[in-house]
């Protein structure tokens, strides 16, 4: 999609890999991962049946920089269905894009269930 290509700094129409995953915690839906990958920077075809996209990328494609945005969004009908929450429920959303030098690697949207809390050290 043009918005994703723009976010990655790529020309519209460039072929990208798209992956949507539902992550569980204690057997319950925890987050939806909506990830786009730039196949031009991947050293081999990824196998996400054995390893999560994030784990695979950390092991195979080093990144040098990235950006992260945090926001809240109301659950769409599809997100509500997957996360088993009411449509319109407030979700914690993390948007991240990473690069290896000047080459875009991936952009991902992580939509967490209501009540998710992120804590970090500074």
Can you say where each PLM-predicted feature lies in the sequence?
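C-terminal all-alpha effector/ligand-binding and dimerization domain
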Residues: 1-122
């Amino acid at each position: 999609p043009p918005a994703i290509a723009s976010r990655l700094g790529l020309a519209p129409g460039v072929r990208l890999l798209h992956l949507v995953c539902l992550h569980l915690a204690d057997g319950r839906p925890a987050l939806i991962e909506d990830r786009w990958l730039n196949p031009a920077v991947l050293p081999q075809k990824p196998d996400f049946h054995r390893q999560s996209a994030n784990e695979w990328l950390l092991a195979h494609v080093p990144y040098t920089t990235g950006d992260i945005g945090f926001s809240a969004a109301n659950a769409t009908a599809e997100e509500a269905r997957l996360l088993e929450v009411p449509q319109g429920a407030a979700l914690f959303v993390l948007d991240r894009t990473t690069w290896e030098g000047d080459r875009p690697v991936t952009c991902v949207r992580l939509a967490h269930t209501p009540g998710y809390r992120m804590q970090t050290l500074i």
